[in-house]
Amino acid sequence: MCRHTHIGFVQGSDTFWSKSNYVAGITHNVLGYATQLTESDFVGLHLFYMDSGDMDVTTVEQPNGFGETFSVTGLSLRGIYTKILTDRLKIGFSIKYLREQIYTTYMQSFVVDIGSNFDTGIYGMVLGMSVSNFGPQVEYKGEGLEIVVDSDLDPDEKLSRITEKFSLPLTFRLGVKNDIIGPNSEFMNMGDMHKLTFAMDGINALDYTVYGTMGLEYTWNNMASVRMGTHLGHDTAGMSFGFGLDYNRIVLDYAFVNYDVLD
């Protein structure tokens, strides 16, 4: 579902933090904050940081390293605005700063994401849509592209390689959500005690094949949740499982995703 309009469901203010241990020692870290300005206006900040962990710097002459290390890092900082247009339609957009660094080489840019969330009124179906990474082409720069040359070629005895510009992966996402059981369900209304939600997304990133995700979440008494889902058409990701606890506005979530050959 559309992430840009999620803050339109905030009551008051919310803070979110998440850490994911990925393959090969890579970590994904997320920090978010959202607040309601008026009955129909919401703003938020979202920080994502990826760190590969330290790796040895190697050369052809010293393939086992020589004591120096480097890391690959990725940073995404978004400012988000969401507007409730009607009781069924929310729209949102974000301005995002991106930076990726490999040792002493980096690329950075500003891009825009847009999205919407629409309650169809048809059997409780809610549709979400987003388009991400509208922006200019980017290229890598930095000291890592410099090579040492003879002073006859350059007085500073170094030249910088010119890298080719490329487009960021424009990504289209379309999702649907339905409360099969719950206070808003068109099928089985059991109050707030039991809630079962089905969600499915289709994702089309221009640098990858089309794939999808689908899952179920059962929530008991608005306090404890269990979840399961799967990826469709993804080359490595498979089933996922998770649970959540919500007590006095403090929420704890845990999830496990099977990446098959990457285990």
Predicted regions and their residues:
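Subset of outer-membrane beta-barrel
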Residues: M1-D263
